[in-house]
Amino acid sequence: NGSIPNPTTDEIMKIRRNHYTGVEQMIADLQMNIQYPVSPVLQAVLCRAFAEVMKLEAGELEINLNRLMNKGVYLLCWIQRYQNQLFKNWKKNDTGCFIHMGACQNVNEVLFMKFLARVPVDVLILCPDRNEHCMLEDTLLYEINYETSMKLDQFPEQNAQLHIGTAAYHAERELDTLMYNDSVIFRDQQF
């Protein structure tokens, strides 16, 4: 709902890292934090996707190595946090689903969505408010934009939070307006 909670201090401390002299060395070492012993095939896919998005990020801005490492640590924290939910009892050709409500608000979320787009996970990003700018752009993501917009702060868990009038409801309201406003006919006296 809105944004992915930032990694906690404990999650960050669990990520092994060293001092690096280059991007390739840093990516190779950081991806060793991705462990999924249940499926070596999936672990290889996760490592490859991590390396791919980190190289894309390094090439886009000619970013400073420490800043890139910080982004990598955030990404690894989120991978470790969500991998068991996304890949529980994973078998080849299984696909998890990650639903994000609202636009991606920071570069770390964008990086995580790019990562998820490269692993066996369907990524659904719902941005019902068209005035909210999403920072995410990726050729692997299919984007659909509708003309209507609505302000919705969090994902509706019960339908009590969201009410959309049907065509019949709006027709009834319009008929009420035409018949009962500025006339001598009153609804409560109608039989």
Where are these regions (language model features)?
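Active-site and donor-binding regions of nucleotide-sugar-utilizing enzymes
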Residues: 49, 54-145
